[in-house]
Amino acid sequence: MAEAEEDCHSDAVRVGDEGHESPAERDLQAQLQMFRAQWMFELTPGVGSSNVESRPCRAGRSSILKAAADKGRQELAKEEKARELFLKAVEEEQNGALYEAIKFYRRAMQLVPDIEFKITYTRSPDGDGVGSSYIEDNEDASKMADLLSYFQQQLTFQESVLKLCQPELETSQTHISVLPMEVLMYIFRWVVSSDLDLRSLEQLSLVCRGFYICARDPEIWRLACLKVWGRSCMKLVPFSSWREMFLERPRVRFDGVYISKTTYIRQGEQSLDGFYRAWHQVEYYRYIRFFPDGHVMMLTTPEEPPSIVPRLRTRNTRTDAILLGHYRLSQDADNQTKVFAVITKKKEEKPLDHKYRYFRRVPVQEADHNFHVGLQLCSSGHQRFNKLIWIHHSCHITYRSTGETAVSAFDIDKMYTPLFFARVRSYTAFSERPL
């Protein structure tokens, strides 16, 4: 015991004499001295835990405990302050004061970056607290009815600038998150394009929460509805949003083509022996392609879809038998949506034949042929608005010399099979103009 006291005393004297040691070495020596003092105290016979500790050990331990307690109180105070600021931001956002909410959100996240995950909202019967009127259940987060509002609360605010997304990995290149909101919305309008490719917009919303919010922008869906229905959709009633109107209201689809296949059997010529007569199975297809600007194309041909569908991407097709025109949507009192179209054959300017210009020829009575088509729009299976049923087909012949019009109506029989929609990816592979 005497040797241990001499070692402790000599170490203390040596530490006091060597004032030129670094701060790290001095801290290490102080910890060693405290440990040895406590060890000596425990080895002293007759001294229990109730006895008074030596002054160096008691002072060192009290200083460490005090520092830890002070640090813990500071962390609790900081978290409590961040909690109050975050709840205040939620309250301001619910009241419509978005700028004030942004300010409180930013201050709260500067204190505690993950404060949103440390808050548990409760509702008390008398509830007079700031967050008493809000409920959050992390276990039932997937059952939230308004996912858009939830994502808006999860946005990250930095230096008063709304950041829709953050890079997952560090990169030296410029990330899309640095773009302002206006530029991002313009990019989203290019994604939708003039072809109304809202399917790509929905896929884009799966990237992150910020893109989800941009994809739910009411202006994009309002412009899409105006392009489809025009002035007949000036009121939202009975729909709650423009997006719901576009998804639920009956409309023709633009990202593909409606196709029908008709098959019939006709009798062939009789053979020479008189005992055999050929029968022919005839197959032909009808194709109808709609465009958002009100144009429509129709083609009847025996060629199969793989060879015809690529030609119908634009109206500038070189197919001779194509019929071009305009269409409109009509909703009757029975809540059935019908499509009416007037189509005509593409006009071709024939060059003048100067070979027979001196011969008298019998004038041919020129006439214009217009076809009037009526279709009923309905859904079948799991797809919406993917079926067109024939309800009217007629040919209007207008003679240019007299101006008279002759109408020939066709009977809608089994030869007019329904047309079913087939989506074509190449139709929306690239954009020509923004929405």
Swiss-Prot record:
Domain F-box: 173-224
Pathway the protein acts in: Protein modification; protein ubiquitination
Main location: cytoplasm
Residue ranges of TPR repeats: 82-115
Recorded superkingdom: Eukaryota
Cited Pfam families: F-box-like, FBO_C
GO cellular component: cytoplasm; SCF ubiquitin ligase complex
GO MF term list: ubiquitin-like ligase-substrate adaptor activity
S-S pairs: none
Localization per Swiss-Prot or TrEMBL: Cytoplasm
Ranges annotated as biased composition (Basic and acidic residues): 7-25
Keyword annotations: Cytoplasm, Phosphoprotein, TPR repeat, Ubl conjugation pathway
Record SUPFAM superfamilies: F-box domain (SSF81383), MIT domain (SSF116846)
InterPro entries in alphabetical order: F-box-like_dom_sf, F-box_dom, Hrt3/FBXO9_C, MIT_dom_sf
GO terms under biological process: fat cell differentiation; innate immune response; proteasome-mediated ubiquitin-dependent protein catabolic process; protein K48-linked ubiquitination; protein ubiquitination; regulation of TOR signaling; SCF-dependent proteasomal ubiquitin-dependent protein catabolic process
Sequence positions bearing Phosphoserine: S124
CDD domains: F-box_FBXO9
Disordered as annotated region, ranges: 1-25
Annotated PANTHER family: F-BOX ONLY PROTEIN 48-RELATED, F-BOX ONLY PROTEIN 9
Quaternary structure annotation from Swiss-Prot or TrEMBL: Part of the SCF (SKP1-CUL1-F-box) E3 ubiquitin-protein ligase complex SCF(FBXO9) composed of CUL1, SKP1, RBX1 and FBXO9. Interacts with TTI1 and TELO2; when TTI1 and TELO2 are phosphorylated by CK2.
Primary role: Substrate recognition component of a SCF (SKP1-CUL1-F-box protein) E3 ubiquitin-protein ligase complex which mediates the ubiquitination and subsequent proteasomal degradation of target proteins and plays a role in several biological processes such as cell cycle, cell proliferation, or maintenance of chromosome stability. Ubiquitinates mTORC1-bound TTI1 and TELO2 when they are phosphorylated by CK2 following growth factor deprivation, leading to their degradation. In contrast, does not mediate ubiquitination of TTI1 and TELO2 when they are part of the mTORC2 complex.
Name by which UniProt lists this protein: F-box only protein 9
